[in-house]
């Protein structure tokens, strides 16, 4: 904000509304998809008033388990002068067709056609936004890539720019296990649900049978496609970040798996009208109720964003910090923490101005600013079941998965490198990187690195994780086995998850190196050893993006607590 400006609150509720169930939206191949609409009604003093509309398109059945939540949110938005459109993706819910896979090209074109159809309705002011959490956030980004003329703004929450690098299928070239299986099974069940009989008509059973016979299990393609290529580029914004031109407001969470994409979009989407990112501690759920807190009134922020870009209200949105994050402190590890301690911080760019790399060298169980004096090697025998002290999914965090516990049981089966107790706080914002010199006796090996803070009692609390299938060390499109003969080491660079954290004086920083992360990733099917080399000839190290206390930052926005909706 400029020094003399104050942010304007979101639109207040002043409209009655009507609901239109099962509105049919025509798309270019002749299908008519099913949508539910919550429409604000013009006030008596402005009978010709028209309204912007916010579209959410997902395959989770708007007329079944999502209906109550949609109704609550639709009423709330309509009262504030926004129409809400909930569209069933083709082949799901009450929409006809077949859902052959997630994020197909025809599905994205359906989104484009729906945006333009909505903009042409007599009750619409011609301005359309999209929003969604997870799948709905993905589709918002994917449709925005096509640049529909009337799509002004999108709000993706916990979404990705790169389906290969950051989704439930592949991580660091490793095939995921728990999360891919959970999602594949749940989506198989949802795709098998019948269309809503009241909307589908008397032949709903026949349509249901056709859907059951024609819809494949999506898992088959995910298992088959283990290297990057055209399959994963479909639906990915990367590498064409300039395709995103509308205004963007992103929501992400440190405890979720989609935090890296938010920071990449913030950094690389230079053609967008504006890009703004909000990162809390949260798992894969709404900031009003997700753990760990603190929580906030995310709907108020949603309405302020859409007020600016769908209603053209000059509320100061574009003058507020581009990135706001919760810098969290040490918390004793637990699966379902109510909140993490810390503070909100803000900056105008990412990478955050003033951030400097801080290098910590691996030694004989040590992590130090100075390189080790002698060369040495640590040998880790591969154990496929190591990993269960961490979170049981890459980022969903829902019951019964939860977040990471005390990491020490896993660390017994790896190599650990630990600093002396810190004398000063150390604030990190950005992407930590482990640079390791390794050899292996396995042609297929996984390297898992965990960054943690160690309390005085020895408890090791997770800060961030990075993984690499070492066959992908040179390429995600053309993997190559690790050499198992000879003495030459290979330098591998393993980025950890983007992190906003403050290490506290008196505690220690630890880097642990493991060979598996079960049940999150499928382990290497081979037996053998991974060796980590360190010393003058093989300078393995951890590089942290440190924000000095003297670095200039901005005043974070003053968020509201969440009201009942």
Walk through the language-model features, giving the residues of each:
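Accessory cap/linker subdomain of secreted extracellular hydrolases
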Residues: 70-71, 79, 145-243
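Alpha/beta-hydrolase fold nucleophile elbow
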Residues: 122-134
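Short beta-strand/loop motif that positions the catalytic acidic residue
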Residues: 244, 250-252
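N-terminal cap/lid segment of alpha/beta-hydrolase-fold proteins
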Residues: 7-49, 418, 422-424
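C-terminal, loop-rich substrate-recognition/catalytic regions characterized by aromatic stacking residues
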Residues: 5-9, 278, 292-565
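Cap/lid segment of the alpha/beta-hydrolase catalytic domain
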Residues: 44-119, 168-169, 443, 455-456, ...
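Active-site-adjacent alpha-helix of alpha/beta-hydrolase-fold enzymes
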Residues: 260-275
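Glycine-rich nucleophile elbow surrounding the catalytic serine of serine-hydrolase chemistry
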Residues: 132-142
């Amino acid at each position: 904000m400029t020094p003399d400006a104050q942010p304007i609150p979101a639109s207040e509720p002043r409209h009655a509304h009507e609901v239109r169930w099962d509105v049919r939206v025509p798309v270019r191949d002749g299908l008519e998809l099913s949508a539910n609409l919550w429409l604000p009604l013009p006030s008596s003093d402005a009978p010709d008033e028209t309204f912007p509309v916010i579209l959410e398109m997902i395959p989770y059945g708007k007329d079944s388990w999502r209906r109550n939540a949609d109704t609550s949110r639709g009423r709330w938005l309509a009262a504030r002068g926004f129409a809400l459109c909930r569209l069933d993706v083709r082949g799901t819910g009450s929409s006809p067709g077949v859902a052959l896979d997630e994020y197909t090209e025809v599905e994205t074109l359906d989104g484009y056609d729906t945006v333009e159809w909505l903009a042409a309705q007599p009750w619409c002011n011609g301005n359309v936004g999209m929003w969604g959490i997870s799948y709905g956030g993905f589709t918002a980004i994917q449709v925005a890539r096509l640049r529909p003329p009337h799509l002004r703004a999108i709000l993706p929450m916990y979404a990705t720019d790169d389906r290969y690098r950051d989704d439930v299928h592949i991580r660091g070239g490793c095939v995921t296990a728990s999360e891919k299986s959970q999602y594949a099974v749940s989506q198989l069940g949802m795709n098998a649900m019948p269309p809503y009989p009241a909307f589908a008509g008397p032949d709903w059973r026949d349509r249901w049978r056709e859907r059951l016979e024609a819809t494949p299990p999506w898992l088959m393609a995910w298992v088959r496609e283990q290297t990057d290529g055209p399959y994963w580029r479909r639906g990915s914004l990367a590498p064409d970040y300039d395709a995103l031109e509308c205004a963007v407001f992103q929501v992400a969470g440190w405890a979720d798996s989609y935090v890296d994409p938010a920071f990449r979009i913030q950094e690389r989407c230079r053609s967008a009208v504006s890009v703004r990112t909000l990162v809390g501690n949260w798992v894969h759920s709404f900031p009003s109720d997700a753990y760990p807190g603190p929580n906030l009134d995310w709907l108020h922020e949603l309405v302020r964003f859409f007020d600016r870009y769908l209603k053209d209200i000059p509320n100061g949105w574009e003058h507020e910090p581009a990135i706001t994050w919760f810098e969290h402190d040490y918390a004793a590890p637990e699966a379902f923490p109510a909140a993490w301690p810390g503070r909100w911080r803000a900056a105008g760019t990412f990478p955050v101005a003033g951030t400097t790399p801080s290098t910590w060298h691996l030694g004989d169980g040590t992590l130090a600013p100075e390189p080790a004096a002698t060369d040495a090697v640590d040998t880790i025998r591969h154990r496929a079941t190591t990993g269960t002290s961490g979170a049981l999914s890459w980022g969903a965090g829902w019951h019964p998965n939860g977040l990471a516990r005390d990491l020490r049981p896993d660390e017994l089966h790896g190599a650990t490198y630990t600093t002396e107790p810190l004398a000063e706080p150390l604030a990190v914002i950005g992407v930590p990187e482990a640079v390791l010199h390794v050899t292996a006796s396995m042609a297929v090996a996984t390297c898992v690195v965990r960054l943690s803070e160690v309390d005085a009692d020895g408890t090791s609390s997770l800060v961030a994780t990075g993984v690499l299938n070492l066959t992908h060390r040179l390429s995600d499109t053309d993997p190559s086995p690790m050499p198992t003969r000879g003495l030459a080491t290979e330098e591998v660079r393993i980025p950890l998850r983007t992190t906003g954290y403050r290490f506290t004086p008196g505690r220690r920083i630890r880097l642990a190196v493991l060979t598996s992360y079960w049940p999150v990733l499928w382990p290497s099917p081979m037996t053998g050893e991974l060796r980590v080399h360190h010393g003058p000839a093989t300078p393995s190290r951890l590089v942290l993006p440190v924000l000095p206390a003297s670095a200039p930052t901005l005043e974070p926005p003053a968020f509201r607590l969440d009201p009942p909706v």
